[in-house]
Amino acid sequence: MVTQFKTASEFDSAIAQDKLVVVDFYATWCGPCKMIAPMIEKFSEQYPQADFYKLDVDELGDVAQKNEVSAMPTLLLFKNGKEVAKVVGANPAAIKQAIAANA
């Protein structure tokens, strides 16, 4: 399951966890974001040891800017509040590899 962030504080709390947290930075107008969404959902089922979230860059632009996200989709992977991997673009193979390497 992929959970939608509503606030910056939800984001901050989630990434501080002692487990892998995968955040999909997307925009509703972004075609590649829509294309990759079902794959992210599938990865969330394949990797239950990780938590999966999505963040609308138009709703939480300050969070996107703070994390230097300028292209969508961008997936950031965090552990203990630190970024451990970044995948820019709709690249399922690279996303899966980043998750597997850090799960």
From Swiss-Prot:
Catalytic site positions: 30 (nucleophile), 33 (nucleophile)
Modification after translation, per record: Reversible disulfide bond formation between Cys-30 and Cys-33, reverted by thioredoxin reductase TRR1 using NADPH as hydrogen donor.
Domain called Thioredoxin: residue spans: 2-103
GO biological process: one example: deoxyribonucleotide biosynthetic process
Record-linked InterPro entries: Thioredoxin, Thioredoxin-like_sf, Thioredoxin_CS, Thioredoxin_domain
Disulfide topology: 30-33
Gene3D superfamilies (UniProt xref): Glutaredoxin (3.40.30.10)
Key word Disulfide bond present: yes
Cross-link position per record: Glycyl lysine isopeptide (Lys-Gly) (interchain with G-Cter in ubiquitin): 54, 66, 96
Keyword Transmembrane: no
A GO cellular component entry from the record: membrane fusion priming complex
Primary localisation category: nucleus
Residues with site note (Contributes to redox potential value): 31-32
Subcellular localization, as worded in the UniProt entry: Nucleus; Cytoplasm; Golgi apparatus membrane; Mitochondrion intermembrane space
Mode of membrane association: Peripheral membrane protein
MF (Gene Ontology): disulfide oxidoreductase activity; protein-disulfide reductase activity
Assembly description: Monomer. Part of the heterodimeric LMA1 complex together with the proteinase inhibitor PBI2. Most of the thioredoxin of yeast is in this complex rather than the well-studied monomer. LMA1 binds to the ATPase SEC18.
Physiological role: Participates as a hydrogen donor in redox reactions through the reversible oxidation of its active center dithiol to a disulfide, accompanied by the transfer of 2 electrons and 2 protons. It is involved in many cellular processes, including deoxyribonucleotide synthesis, repair of oxidatively damaged proteins, protein folding, sulfur metabolism, and redox homeostasis. Thioredoxin-dependent enzymes include phosphoadenosine-phosphosulfate reductase MET16, alkyl-hydroperoxide reductase DOT5, thioredoxin peroxidases TSA1 and TSA2, alkyl hydroperoxide reductase AHP1, and peroxiredoxin HYR1.
Family according to the record: Belongs to the thioredoxin family.
Note: Present with 8579 molecules/cell in log phase SD medium. Yeast has two cytoplasmic thioredoxins, TRX1 and TRX2, and one mitochondrial, TRX3.
Protein name: Thioredoxin-1
Gene field: TRX1
